[in-house]
């Protein structure tokens, strides 16, 4: 049977808690975490499947799935009369009284979905990675190879081996897996590049009957964690029936040379932050603006973003940033940041190298640097976030080892004291980094810009003093 005649069912594993992304996952499943101003993490997996031509998709959910289920129902509506659907399927205890015990058990408990649709091929993908991929190319290789299971693979730095499934390729057949170990303490590097190893992307293609058989075998075992990477893939490797798909071979329309093999696991706060910073350069490491392979999401009903002068005639600006619908920058300065829908940045404030989610409000003269603020956080005037790790920790904010400060959804920011006001005032001085770079070779323009900045800061200070007097 040719690929065009094969029936394909896609299963998205979206039940993970995402403990390493806390506090962003305190009230939502990891695939529902907002990303890049207006998306949810799951939008990347679903967009890739839809763009690949796969329009029968089930999403297996479990942990705090309300916002995820709502997003899927409001965003991913298809014509069910034509046999197309994206269906959110929660844990239902169809097999015994337990909830999903692992990724493999999630599919095992949902085998009725496979039996009902009777596909030839099952594509299984994770819901929390940022990338573009044409799965039809992977399916085509899978069918041609005769393998019963195929794993998508990407090269990663050797020091990250303990975070991924590690693939060893058969020396006589580069499309066959010789060994697969889930998250080993260490692993040898590739022969072609000893600094890298071949990591599983968590994306799989199976012959449907072979997958069903493997899941039944796994369910009967006592020595299993019911995990796709830890148990099901090794089962096929032991049988000599597991293939590997090299992600670098995947060809995406409209991709740039820089982002064509981009894949980011955003399972930690630091990697989540870094993925945002990958978006904002003029030639980004990952290009959101590829209209030939769009990433779909629910369209905001908010009005366009607006940049206006503040009450003290300070100019609202955003440099090297992504700004979503409904954002108002009223006399503040935004640099190297991502602002989600309906965020507000007041006069004299500065947001630098940060991620602000929906409806975050930044008060006058506040400074935010290298921080992630979840929805509905209100930052009072003159506050300093991300400038002093000890101060941030004392106020109950999460601070990562690399120095990223994270505020949870709706977290209360206390009014700043004198020391904090002085700290934020110190960091408001001077030109934005982007302006410094742009005027590096023109001292006259740099001097003029510095005078304007000094004037703005003086007016902000005067306004703050007047407010304190009253």
Swiss-Prot record:
Q: By its UniProt entry, which InterPro entries does this protein fall under?
A: ADP-Glc_PPase, ADP_Glu_pyroP_CS, GlgC_bac, GlmU/GlgC-like_hexapep, NTP_transferase_dom, Nucleotide-diphossugar_trans, Trimer_LpxA-like_sf
What pathway, per the record?
A: Glycan biosynthesis; glycogen biosynthesis
Transmembrane domains' residue ranges = none
Keywords from the named record: ATP-binding, Carbohydrate metabolism, Glycogen biosynthesis, Glycogen metabolism, Nucleotide-binding, Nucleotidyltransferase, Transferase
Under the heading Gene3D superfamilies, the entry gives: Hexapeptide repeat proteins, Spore Coat Polysaccharide Biosynthesis Protein SpsA, Chain A
User: Which amino acid positions bind alpha-D-glucose 1-phosphate, per UniProt?
Assistant: 165, 182-183, 200
Task: Name the Pfam families for this protein.
Answer: Hexapep_GlmU (PF24894), NTP_transferase (PF00483)
- Top enzyme class of this protein? transferase
E.C. numbers: 2.7.7.27
| Recorded catalytic activity of this chain's protein | alpha-D-glucose 1-phosphate + ATP + H(+) = ADP-alpha-D-glucose + diphosphate
An example GO biological process term is: glycogen biosynthetic process
Annotated GO molecular function terms are: ATP binding; glucose-1-phosphate adenylyltransferase activity
State the protein's purpose.
Involved in the biosynthesis of ADP-glucose, a building block required for the elongation reactions to produce glycogen. Catalyzes the reaction between ATP and alpha-D-glucose 1-phosphate (G1P) to produce pyrophosphate and ADP-Glc.
Give the UniProt family note: Belongs to the bacterial/plant glucose-1-phosphate adenylyltransferase family.
Q: PANTHER family under this entry?
A: GLUCOSE-1-PHOSPHATE ADENYLYLTRANSFERASE, GLUCOSE-1-PHOSPHATE ADENYLYLTRANSFERASE-RELATED
Quaternary structure, from the entry: Homotetramer.
Q: What is this protein called?
A: Glucose-1-phosphate adenylyltransferase
């Amino acid at each position: 049977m040719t690929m065009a005649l094969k029936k394909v069912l896609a299963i998205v594993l979206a039940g993970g808690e995402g403990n390493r992304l806390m506090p962003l996952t305190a009230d939502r499943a990891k695939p529902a975490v907002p990303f890049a101003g207006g998306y949810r993490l799951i939008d990347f997996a679903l967009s890739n499947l839809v763009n690949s031509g796969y329009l029968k998709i089930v999403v297996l959910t479990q942990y705090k799935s309300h916002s995820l289920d709502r997003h899927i129902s409001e965003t991913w509506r298809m014509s069910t009369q034509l046999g197309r659907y994206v269906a959110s399927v929660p844990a239902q205890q169809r097999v015994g009284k337990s909830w999903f015990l692992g990724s493999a058990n999630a599919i095992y408990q949902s085998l009725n979905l496979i039996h009902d649709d009777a596909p030839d091929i099952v594509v299984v993908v994770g819901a929390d990675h940022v990338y573009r991929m044409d799965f039809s190319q992977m399916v085509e290789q899978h069918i041609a190879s005769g393998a019963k299971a195929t794993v998508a693979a990407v090269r990663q730095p050797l020091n990250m081996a303990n975070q991924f499934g590690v693939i060893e390729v058969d020396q006589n057949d580069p499309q066959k897996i010789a060994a697969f170990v889930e998250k080993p303490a260490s692993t040898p590097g590739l022969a072609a590049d000893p600094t890298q190893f071949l990591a599983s992307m968590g994306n799989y293609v199976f012959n449907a009957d072979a997958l069903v058989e493997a899941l039944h075998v796994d369910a009967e075992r006592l020595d299993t964690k019911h995990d796709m990477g830890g148990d099901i893939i090794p089962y096929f490797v032991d049988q000599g029936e597991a293939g590997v798909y090299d992600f670098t071979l995947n060809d995406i329309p409209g991709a740039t040379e820089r982002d064509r093999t981009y894949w980011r696991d955003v399972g930690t706060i630091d990697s989540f932050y870094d993925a945002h910073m990958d978006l904002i350069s003029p030639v980004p490491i990952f290009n959101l603006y590829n209209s030939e392979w769009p990433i779909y999401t629910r369209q905001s009903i908010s009005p366009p973003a607006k940049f206006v002068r503040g009450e003290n005639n300070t100019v609202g600006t955003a440099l090297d940033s992504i700004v979503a619908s409904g954002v108002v920058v009223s006399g503040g300065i935004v640099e190297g940041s991502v602002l989600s829908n309906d965020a507000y940045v007041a006069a004299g404030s500065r947001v630098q190298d940060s991620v602000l989610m929906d409806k975050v409000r930044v008060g006058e003269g506040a400074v935010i640097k290298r921080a992630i603020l979840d929805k509905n956080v209100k930052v009072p005037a003159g506050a300093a976030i991300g400038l002093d790790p000890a101060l941030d920790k004392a106020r109950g904010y999460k601070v990562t080892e690399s120095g990223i400060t994270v505020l949870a959804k709706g977290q209360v920011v206390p009014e700043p004291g004198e020391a904090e006001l002085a700290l934020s005032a110190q960091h408001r001085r001077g030109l934005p980094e982007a302006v410094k770079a742009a005027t590096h070779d023109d001292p006259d323009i740099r001097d003029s810009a510095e005078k304007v900045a000094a004037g703005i800061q003086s007016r902000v200070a005067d306004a703050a003093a007047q407010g304190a007097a009253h």
